[in-house]
Amino acid sequence: MSETVFEPTDHPHRRYNPLIDQWVLVSPHRAKRPWQGQQEKLSEEQKPSHDPNCYLCPRNKRITGEPNPDYHKPYVFKNDFSALLENTPAPEQSDDPLFQMGQARGESRVICFSPDHSKTLPLLTALEIEEVIKVWQAQLRELGQKYQWVQIFENKGAAMGCSNPHPHGQIWANSFLPNEVSREDVAQRNYYEKHGSVLLVDYVQKELEKKERIVVETEHWVAVVPYWAVWPFETLLLPKVHVKRLTELTEAQAKDLAVILKKLATKYDNLFETSFPYSMGFHAAPFNGEDNEHWQLHAHFYPPLLRSATVRKFMVGYEMLGESQRDLTAEQAAERLRALSEVHYKER
């Protein structure tokens, strides 16, 4: 009897994520199983450019009763229901190692990407996305003077818990380093001390050589389905050279970031011809007074959809109790995304 030869597209295996020192279980054969579970509701109704009932549109009143200005570019305001507060006092320290508290000071802000209620990121022009990037950079410069971590992110779509359909993102600044970022900080620092080079700079060079997980590439940036991806069509957006923060981008790199963000978001929408839900955000060197040479700027895109516009991946059971698990391989996901048009399906 001949021995079975391992095939990554057929056989279960584990992949290591050096960025957070964790493993993911890959089970490609499970993609063939029938699905009779929950399906998401499609919401493809035509949205107006201005919704009089939307509390993020220009000139409308927000939930607090305060009116929005008649803004024409990206607009930032303090989150009306902030998760973090500026003047939070420090809790009393406990001697009991099982019951510890830490101080959590910070600020939460909202950024409306444009005044147009109907235009998500892929439907904006590259020039309009450039304006969003400029605001991100300005917010980082301001908040980075007061807080060691500033998290820029977007939850797109009801499937990701987005409470308002007007295209917007969030900016949370805090006095502490969050768990995910701390894991990345430790892993990148350890790699730098051991190898004398930057983990994600080495990684991006190898991905550019291999090409099999590249989704879209521009002059200064590349988006890949990372080798260790957890979510079905997860991507990692990376500059091709060492850059620690968004605020350190050259003008050419910033312009090119707008281009690749539009291309990547368009491919996502084109996959199932729907407004593709995801959570995305940037990770970069903290503002903690250290040189942070081990850090590399990058953005994570975590989309939940798996088989169609209505069937999503659920992180439950084994994923919550054991370790993350995915069905299709990173290479299969990249191949599907790479083959998609960079022209949005609504604009063909």
Annotate each language-model stretch with its function.
Residues 256-275, 279:
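Extended C-terminal subregions enriched in glycine
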